[in-house]
């Protein structure tokens, strides 16, 4: 059996290592699946992020067929403000627009995690409320100039410099970083338990 993380994210790699520490000799490899992340018509944010996590796990499985009995973990994170998705910014101006919209407001971070072994798939969704302090245009410009926002949903990283903007969080910190630890541990255990009953 081989655990596989369908993500190249160093943040998710670190979090998965934490989530699996209670599993005997927990080790995993990483693959980088490429999927179409377009939102479907009328798809809710929660349905969208859950679908992407499942599709990443399934695409990761396709890249892991050479491994013995792969179990693949996929995850996706989105930021939702006023019902609108804030994905990764397309350019610095887009990052500035997103950060301006988040300034002084509370938004929802949704992270879905999914595990598949090809025969079954399990998933969980975690929602966390994050409040930003009010940001000046200078704050935003300096932050965008660091480059940190460019590969992150909502144009900020709570575990990095962007954490300076967070005034309050209600929910899972690790989920905002990219992989909810409690939910991931539960899925790892559930997948192991199902295998034991076969």
From Swiss-Prot:
GO terms for molecular function: dTTP diphosphatase activity; UTP diphosphatase activity. It catalyses: dTTP + H2O = dTMP + diphosphate + H(+); UTP + H2O = UMP + diphosphate + H(+). Keywords: Cytoplasm, Hydrolase, Nucleotide metabolism. One of its GO terms (biological process) is nucleotide metabolic process. NCBIfam families: maf. It comes from Shewanella denitrificans (strain OS217 / ATCC BAA-1090 / DSM 15013). It comes from the Bacteria. This is dTTP/UTP pyrophosphatase. Pfam families: Maf. The record marks 11, 77, 159 as: Important for substrate specificity. HAMAP family: Maf (MF_00528). Its cofactor is a divalent metal cation. Its EC number is 3.6.1.9. It is found in: Cytoplasm. One of its GO terms (cellular component) is cytoplasm. The active site is at 76 (proton acceptor). InterPro entries: ITPase-like_fam, Maf-like. Nucleoside triphosphate pyrophosphatase that hydrolyzes dTTP and UTP. May have a dual role in cell division arrest and in preventing the incorporation of modified nucleotides into cellular nucleic acids. Belongs to the Maf family. YhdE subfamily.
């Amino acid at each position: 059996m081989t655990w596989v993380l369908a993500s190249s994210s160093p943040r998710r790699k670190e979090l998965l290592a934490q989530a699996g520490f209670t599993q005997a000799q927990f080790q995993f490899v990483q693959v980088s699946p490429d999927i179409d992340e377009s939102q479907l018509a009328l798809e809710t944010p929660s349905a969208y992020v859950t679908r992407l996590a499942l599709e990443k796990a399934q695409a990761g499985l396709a890249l892991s067929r050479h491994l013995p009995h792969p179990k693949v973990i996929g995850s996706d994170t989105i930021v939702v403000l006023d019902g609108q998705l804030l994905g990764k910014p397309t350019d610095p101006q887009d990052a500035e627009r997103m950060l301006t919209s988040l300034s002084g407001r509370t938004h929802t971070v949704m992270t879905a995690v999914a595990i598949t072994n090809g025969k079954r798939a399990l998933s969980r969704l975690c929602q966390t409320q994050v409040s930003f302090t009010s940001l000046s245009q200078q704050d935003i410009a300096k932050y965008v100039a660091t480059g940190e926002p460019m590969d992150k949903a909502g144009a900020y990283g709570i575990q990095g410099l962007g954490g300076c903007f967070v005034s309050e969080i209600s929910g899972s910190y690790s989920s905002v970083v990219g992989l909810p630890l409690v939910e991931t541990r539960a899925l790892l255990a559930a997948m192991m338990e199902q295998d034991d009953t076969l």
